[in-house]
Structures are given as structure tokens and as C-alpha cells.
């Protein structure tokens, strides 16, 4: 089941201003200051199990965002904006930098007479 845009909007309202999202296969990847910290999967917010996240949410259920993925932590207290802000700020230093996507160059096809 894909996540709804309405739920994504609610999630972004609860997160600090520096939070962004990107649609991916019916779900949403979440970024804090341009680093991936988790995502919205089946209308659930799952975050990476960094030491800070585990420390702040030691009893959080571990769930799979999709088949074949690594376990992530379920963010259950999304309504507490101060907690969410503290969680993301603590996780930030532990998250890897997001790799920039390379733009693919369009190859010319001289054999195709319709190519312009």
C-alpha cells in the first residue's frame, strides 16, 4: 500500500523546517539538512537505527520498510514536535552525506533518421 500525500504533509508539519521529501515508488524518502534519515512507508515513519535514535527510542519497534530492506525504527511519537526535532538533530551527525545523483548524458543516435 502506498503512503498518502496527506500523511506525508502531516509528517512534514511535525518535522523541523529543514526537512524535505522525495517520492520513490509510491513511498517517500525523508531528508534532514540534505541527509537521508528515514522515510514514510505504508503511512508509517521509519528512521535509520543510528546510535542516537536507538538511545532516544530504545523500545521502538523495528520494522521493514519493504521486502529485502534493513530494519528501521518506527517513530511512534510523531505528535511531539520537540522530540522529533531533538531526534533529527542528534541523528544528523551520524548520518552519511547524501550522494549527488549524476545526470545521464543523452547519447546521439546518428543511425536513426528521426533523431534531431
Where are these regions (language model features)?
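Charge-dense, helix-prone N-terminal extensions
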Residues: 1-116
Amino acid at each position: 500500500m502506498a503512503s498518502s500525500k496527506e500523511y506525508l504533509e502531516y509528517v512534514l508539519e511535525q518535522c523541523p523546517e529543514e526537512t524535505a521529501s522525495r517520492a520513490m515508488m509510491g513511498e517517500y524518502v525523508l531528508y534532514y539538512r540534505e541527509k537521508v534519515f528515514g522515510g514514510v512507508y505504508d503511512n508509517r515513519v521509519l528512521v535509520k537505527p543510528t546510535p542516537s535514535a536507538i538511545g532516544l527510542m530504545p523500545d521502538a519497534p523495528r520494522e521493514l520498510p519493504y521486502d529485502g530492506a534493513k530494519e528501521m525504527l518506527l517513530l511512534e511519537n510523531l505528535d511531539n514536535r520537540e522530540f522529533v526535532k531533538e531526534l533529527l538533530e542528534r541523528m544528523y551527525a551520524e548520518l552519511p552525506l547524501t550522494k549527488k545523483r549524476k545526470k545521464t548524458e543523452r547519447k546521439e543516435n546518428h543511425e536513426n533518421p528521426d533523431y534531431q
